[in-house]
C-alpha cells in the first residue's frame, strides 16, 4: 500500500464527528436537534466501514495459491462480483459489478480472494477507470498469469441524483493485460463468458 493510500491516523473520531456537525450546520440544520444528536457518530462509523480498504493490502489476499490443480491452464472467470464504492469527486456512491478472468500460469487462487481484492479497492474513494486498472494490475503482479481481464460496471449516483440527473445509466470500463490484450480469441472468450449487458 502506498503512503498516499494510508489513512491519516492523526485525525480522531471526535474530529470526524465535529466535521459532520459542521456540514449539518452548513446545510441549514441544527446538530443539537434530537433526531441529529447521534448522526455525527453514525456517519463517522459508516465512513470507517465504507472506506476500510485504506487499511488493507489487496495483494496479501492473493499470496496463498494452489499449485496442484491437475494441470488446469484454461480460462478462470469470476463474474458478477457486486461492489459499493464512492466517487472521489463528489463522495457519492458507485454501485455495480466486477467481472474478473485470468489464464493461470501454475498458480490458482481461491475464488473468494478475487472478490476480496475487488472489495479492498472498492472501499476507497475511487474513479472507476482507476479501480479497474488497480484490480487487473494487482492480479497480474501477484499471480503472474498469462493474462488478466477485468470489466467493471457501475451506476454513479453523482450522475443520477445531481447534475444531469440521468437514471438507468451504467458505465462500463475494462482493463486487459497479457494474452487478454494480445490475443483477440482469448479476449472474445472472456467477454462471451461475462456477457456484459446481455441475457444469460
UniProtKB/Swiss-Prot annotation:
Q: Mind telling me what this protein is named?
A: GTP cyclohydrolase 1
InterPro entries (alphabetical): GTP-CH-I_C/QueF, GTP-CH-I_N, GTP_CycHdrlase_I, GTP_CycHdrlase_I_CS, GTP_CycHdrlase_I_dom
The family database entries (Pfam families) matched by this protein are listed as: GTP_cyclohydroI
Q: Which cysteines are joined by disulfide bonds?
A: none
The protein's matches in NCBIfam families, at most eight in alphabetical order, are given as: folE, PRK09347.1-2, PRK09347.1-3
Q: What class of enzyme is it?
A: hydrolase
Q: Which UniProt keywords apply?
A: GTP-binding, Hydrolase, Metal-binding, Nucleotide-binding, One-carbon metabolism, Zinc
Extract one GO cellular component term from the record. cytoplasm
PROSITE patterns membership: GTP_CYCLOHYDROL_1_1 (PS00859), GTP_CYCLOHYDROL_1_2 (PS00860)
Question: What positions does the entry give for Zn(2+) binding?
Answer: 87, 90, 158
- In Gene Ontology terms, what is a biological process of this protein? one-carbon metabolic process
Q: Which family does it belong to?
A: Belongs to the GTP cyclohydrolase I family.
EC number(s) recorded for this UniProt protein:
3.5.4.16
Single GO MF descriptor: GTP cyclohydrolase I activity
User: Which HAMAP family does this entry report, sorted A to Z?
Assistant: FolE
Relate the assembly described in the record.
Toroid-shaped homodecamer, composed of two pentamers of five dimers.
Tell me the gene name: folE
Give the highest taxon in the source lineage. Answer: Bacteria
Catalysed reactions, as listed in the record: GTP + H2O = 7,8-dihydroneopterin 3'-triphosphate + formate + H(+)
Q: List the SUPFAM superfamilies.
A: Tetrahydrobiopterin biosynthesis enzymes-like (SSF55620)
Pathway membership, UniProt: Cofactor biosynthesis; 7,8-dihydroneopterin triphosphate biosynthesis; 7,8-dihydroneopterin triphosphate from GTP: step 1/1
Amino acid at each position: 500500500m502506498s503512503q498516499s493510500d494510508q489513512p491519516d491516523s492523526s485525525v480522531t473520531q471526535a474530529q470526524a464527528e465535529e466535521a459532520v456537525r459542521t456540514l449539518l450546520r452548513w446545510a441549514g440544520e441544527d446538530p443539537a436537534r434530537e433526531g441529529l444528536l447521534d448522526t455525527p457518530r453514525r456517519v463517522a462509523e459508516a465512513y470507517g466501514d465504507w472506506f476500510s480498504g485504506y487499511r488493507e493490502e489487496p495483494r496479501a489476499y492473493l499470496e496463498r495459491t494452489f499449485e496442484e490443480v491437475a494441470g488446469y491452464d484454461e480460462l478462470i472467470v469470476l463474474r458478477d462480483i457486486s461492489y459499493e464504492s464512492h466517487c472521489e469527486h463528489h463522495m457519492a456512491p458507485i454501485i455495480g459489478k466486477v467481472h474478473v478472468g485470468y489464464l493461470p500460469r501454475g498458480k490458482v487462487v481461491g475464488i473468494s480472494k478475487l472478490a476480496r481484492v475487488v472489495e479492498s479497492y472498492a472501499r476507497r474513494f475511487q474513479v472507476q477507470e482507476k479501480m479497474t486498472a488497480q484490480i487487473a494490475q494487482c492480479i497480474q503482479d501477484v499471480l503472474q498469469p498469462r493474462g488478466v481481464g477485468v470489466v467493471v460496471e457501475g451506476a454513479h449516483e453523482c450522475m443520477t441524483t445531481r447534475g444531469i440527473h440521468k437514471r438507468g445509466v451504467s458505465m462500463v470500463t475494462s482493463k486487459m493485460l497479457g494474452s487478454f490484450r494480445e490475443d483477440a480469441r482469448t479476449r472474445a472468450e472472456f467477454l462471451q463468458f461475462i456477457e456484459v449487458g446481455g441475457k444469460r
